[in-house]
Amino acid sequence: MKDKIFIFLQYIIPHSLTSRLVSKLAESKNKHLKNYLINLAIKKFKIDISEAKETDINKYTSFNNFFIRELKDGLRPISSDKKIISSPADGVLSEFGDITNGSLVQAKGKTFTLKALIADSSTTDFTKFATIYLSPKDYHRVHMPIDGKLTKMVYIPGKLFSVNKVTAQNVDDLFAKNERLVCYFKTEIGEVAVIFVGALLVAGIETVWHGKVAPNYYKDIQIWNYDNDSFNIEFKKGDTLGWFNFGSTVIILMPNNNISFKYNQSNANISVNQDLALIAE
């Protein structure tokens, strides 16, 4: 019954208004308010502040500034092996595997289509996927899983349903309904996409090359092309791509290149830069 009420509320809550109000609070530079919110989050979500590069909460200019905190150097080591694809984020590896008949697994018994997720029917090379859920306690920066060059970024407007186990099991096409940002990269194994999926209370999605992309008020899909001579935006495995100002989900799409995952089952905890998959010879 509790889950049904929660799902019902997801459909009647004004998603954008609620998220904008939360964003105003999260961006406040009032010292007393931001310190109260930071301390509340640390206590409620059991955030390990000792992992942060800056452990003094007074040094953070806002709650958002705290949520996109950097980690201490060397805390998330990364493999130098070019055959290893690393995790782009801290969180829970909620689902992963093959894209079968154009569909990805959302949760047990539920799938959604690749076409709906990326709003593009022309891309057919993606055959593997991994979905990582970031809870409020997690590190919120997203990193490059493999060496690559940015070729395109697509903002897709949408809803802002909460993203968690309950909504994944009960809201059809959850990740294809929510606001999202799809970043395409040219890599040695082919095209790879890293997708930032928005959610209720997520105060924003930002990238290192563009700045804040969401939330915004576009009603239509927005496309930025970077695959020409005037741009040369390249990333090494482990480089920072961007961040969420609260929490949500990252989906990585990969081509068929004899990729095997290093995990046997879903819902495993995973850390950024940890080995996610292996590229076979």
Swiss-Prot record:
Keyword Lyase: yes
Gene Ontology CC terms, in alphabetical order: plasma membrane
Domain of life of the native organism: Bacteria
Record text on cofactor binding: Binds 1 pyruvoyl group covalently per subunit.
Subcellular location: Cell membrane
Pfam families: PS_Dcarbxylase
Site positions for Cleavage (non-hydrolytic): 247-248
GO biological process: phosphatidylethanolamine biosynthetic process
Catalytic residues as annotated in Swiss-Prot or TrEMBL: 90 (charge relay system), 143 (charge relay system), 248 (charge relay system), 248 (schiff-base intermediate with substrate)
Membrane topology designation: Peripheral membrane protein
Protein keywords: Cell membrane, Decarboxylase, Lipid biosynthesis, Lipid metabolism, Lyase, Membrane, Phospholipid biosynthesis, Phospholipid metabolism, Pyruvate, Zymogen
E.C. number(s) listed in UniProt: 4.1.1.65
Modified residues (Pyruvic acid (Ser)): 248
Pathway membership, UniProt: Phospholipid metabolism; phosphatidylethanolamine biosynthesis; phosphatidylethanolamine from CDP-diacylglycerol: step 2/2
Entry keyword annotation includes Magnesium: no
Cofactor needs: pyruvate
Functional summary from the UniProt entry: Catalyzes the formation of phosphatidylethanolamine (PtdEtn) from phosphatidylserine (PtdSer).
Family: Belongs to the phosphatidylserine decarboxylase family. PSD-B subfamily. Prokaryotic type I sub-subfamily.
Subunit field text: Heterodimer of a large membrane-associated beta subunit and a small pyruvoyl-containing alpha subunit.
Protein name: Phosphatidylserine decarboxylase proenzyme
Originating organism: Francisella philomiragia subsp. philomiragia (strain ATCC 25017 / CCUG 19701 / FSC 153 / O#319-036)
